[in-house]
Design a protein with these regions (language model features):
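Catalytic cores of nucleotide-sugar-dependent glycosyltransferases that transfer UDP/GDP/TDP-activated
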Residues: 1-127
């Protein structure tokens, strides 16, 4: 999901009335080794890269943070990923967009509570 906000901005935002009110949300529920992507691959996919991001390999969450209208991070009791994610330069630069949802349990989280919190975040985007 981290590449979608930039792809949307680059290819669809402002193209016509249909896309005018669409907002993008980057949801992060897990950090893994697949979040690193080469700058060249991002450029080939025409994903815009903010000037502050340096290097040949970039973190996709950093890239997406600049273009998403909101960033939702779901922390688990055993893995508080929001703390790690907020140390990433692109996410830190966009911390005003970040909302953290704390899951109640690793194995059986309260999905209704998570959905309700996400719904509140989405409602703020449409105001």
């Amino acid at each position: 999901t981290a590449m979608v906000p930039g792809m949307f901005k680059n290819h669809f935002e402002g193209k016509n009335e249909f896309y005018k009110k669409i907002k993008t949300v980057m949801v992060v529920h897990d950090l893994n080794e697949y979040s690193d992507i080469s700058r060249k691959d991002l450029e080939l996919a025409e994903v815009p890269i903010d000037k502050m991001l340096k290097g040949d390999v970039l973190n996709s969450f950093d890239v997406g943070a600049f273009h998403a209208n909101a960033i939702v991070v779901i922390d688990k009791p055993s893995d508080v990923i929001s703390e790690k994610l907020l140390k990433q330069p692109g996410v830190a630069a966009n911390k005003k967009k970040v909302s953290v949802i704390k899951a109640s349990d690793d194995e059986s989280p309260n999905y209704q509570m998570i959905a309700d919190e996400m719904d509140q975040i989405f409602k703020k985007l449409s105001d």
